[in-house]
From Swiss-Prot:
One of its GO terms (cellular component) is plasma membrane. Has multiple subunits with at least A(3), B(3), C, D, E, F, H, I and proteolipid K(x). GO terms for molecular function: ATP binding; proton-transporting ATP synthase activity, rotational mechanism. The gene is atpB. It is a peripheral membrane protein. Belongs to the ATPase alpha/beta chains family. This is A-type ATP synthase subunit B. Component of the A-type ATP synthase that produces ATP from ADP in the presence of a proton gradient across the membrane. The B chain is a regulatory subunit. The lineage of its organism: Archaea, Methanobacteriati, Methanobacteriota, Stenosarchaea group, Methanomicrobia. It is found in: Cell membrane. SUPFAM superfamilies: C-terminal domain of alpha and beta subunits of F1 ATP synthase, P-loop containing nucleoside triphosphate hydrolases. Its main location: membrane. One of its GO terms (biological process) is proton motive force-driven plasma membrane ATP synthesis. NCBIfam families: ATP_syn_B_arch, PRK04196.1.
Length: 460
């Protein structure tokens, strides 16, 4: 027999406090019955004392102490089916595209669990995004978690959509899917995401979850877990390689802070909960490859750094959990460069596992290292030119200064719909490296220079 409690003691922000007489499970789903016959859903946040703390998904406006509370004994579940592909859903899994509700093959608990480290396989297969600054110098590897560090006003949404459209595991295109989850976005951004997915045809192999800024903060905490549960289902039940794009993790962390404040928790750094590191890890650590499974889950979380501060707790803690970072640069954006990705502070820690002969191309690492070194030197020389002028530079220094400009104009810059193969990316790299004297290409083996350098290829 289902019991209805009418023992609400307090309503504060998105939280309802209920006196209980029987044990209640953590994260148990609750139904709130209003006097007008409508219902709302909530989730148990704390059941350690006689007072249960419940967060309400639809907000607490209109609730009072006369409302009935029913504990369902179930956790929040995703209706999982292969029919998820091609659908646009709300942050809590409700259809936004006018289609029917998903008829589930399984109902999966969205809280999931981090992978057993013993069951993990090391990531080693290249994922092609079609963006040279990622594929060429900060390669994404299947099973990796590689965040994009951006900032307010920078085109991280455009970059996210371009990756969603273009990403593929070469040779496994038929088994590749994208799960895209946006948190705390405006209605305008939601329309932009929906129309882009529909116009470009990317929706056919994607599942999209959209949580709007005016949706309850509680739903923002649920959204990435819905997305990751969908990804795990497609990966481990249907053998697909799934790329999960989560944007914007900063909005997720703000929702955590808001919920912590509503519960009168003692805040940590800059007002964020002390458990934020652990909470972020429960999201990021759901990426990977499991022994015996055909599919995999790869993550690209996108976060906007408040005040462009890379030491802010959100990027700082994310950096400890993830395997590198792609940094979007305001300086390059001001120059009109798209995508404005700065390769110097960017890093993919698993890059060397996913490149080379049989994966990308034998010269990949050498070309990447040489371009990185040349661009770093050219950037340093720009600072020197600002002090002493270009006339004071040697002929060699001028070549590196010009190389930095070519790198930004030809390698970094590409169209929003330009999908470069890894061969295209490396060939562009060789084209701009040809601007440097051969005796300055010290990071590239001579056999690769003889095989791929434009000056030698012409004679072949």
């Amino acid at each position: 027999m289902v019991k209805e409690y009418k023992t609400i003691t307090q309503i504060a922000g998105p939280l309802v406090f209920v006196e209980k007489t029987e044990p209640v499970g953590y994260k148990e789903i609750v139904t709130i019955n209003l006097p007008d016959g409508t219902t709302r859903r909530g989730e148990v946040l704390d059941s350690s004392s006689d007072i249960v703390v419940i967060q309400i998904f639809e907000g607490t406006t209109g609730l009072d102490k006369e409302c009935g509370v029913v504990f369902t004994g179930e956790t929040l579940k995703l209706p999982a089916s292969i029919d998820l592909l091609g659908r646009i859903l709300s942050g809590s899994g409700e259809p936004l595209d006018g289609g029917p509700r998903i008829v589930p093959d399984q109902l999966l608990d969205i809280n999931g669990a981090a992978m057993n480290p013993y069951a993990r396989l090391p990531p080693k297969d290249f994922i092609q995004t079609g963006i040279s600054t990622i594929d060429g110098t900060n390669t994404l590897v299947r099973g990796q978690k590689l965040p994009i560090f951006s900032a307010s006003g920078l085109p991280h949404n455009e970059i996210a959509l371009q990756i969603a459209r273009q990403a593929a595991v070469p040779g496994s295109e038929s088994a590749f899917a994208v799960v895209f989850a946006a948190m705390g976005i405006t209605n305008e951004e939601a329309q932009y995401f929906m129309s882009d997915f529909e116009k470009t045809g990317a929706l056919e192999r994607a599942v999209v979850f959209l949580n709007l800024a005016d949706d309850p903060a509680v739903e923002r905490i649920v959204t990435p877990r819905m997305a990751l549960t969908a990804a795990e289902y497609l990966a481990y039940e249907h053998g697909m390689h799934v790329l999960v794009i989560l944007t914007d993790i900063t909005n997720y962390a703000e929702a955590l802070r808001q919920m912590g404040a509503a519960r009168n928790e003692i805040p940590g750094r800059r007002g964020y909960p002390g458990y934020m590191y652990t909470d972020l890890a429960t999201l990021y650590e759901r990426a990977g490859i499991v022994k015996g499974a055909k599919g995999s889950v790869t993550q690209i979380p996108i976060l906007s750094m408040p005040g462009d501060d890379i030491t802010h707790p959100i990027p700082d803690l994310s950096g400890y959990i993830t395997e590198g970072q792609i940094v979007v640069s305001r300086e390059l954006h001001r120059k009109g460069i798209y995508p404005p990705i700065n390769v110097l502070p960017s890093l993919s820690r698993l890059m060397n596992s996913g490149i080379g002969a049989g994966k990308t191309r034998e010269d990949h690492k050498a070309v990447s290292d040489q371009m990185y070194a040349g661009y770093a030197e050219g950037r340093d020389l720009r600072g020197l030119v600002a002090i002493v002028g270009k006339e004071a530079l040697s002929e060699r220094d001028v070549k590196f200064l010009e190389f930095a400009d070519l790198f930004e104009q030809q390698f970094v810059t590409q169209g929003r719909n330009e999908n470069r193969t890894i061969a295209d990316t490396l060939d562009i790299g060789w084209k701009i490296l040809a601007h440097l004297p051969e005796n300055q290409l010290g990071r590239i083996d001579n056999k690769y220079i003889q095989k791929y350098h434009p000056a030698h290829r012409k004679g072949q």
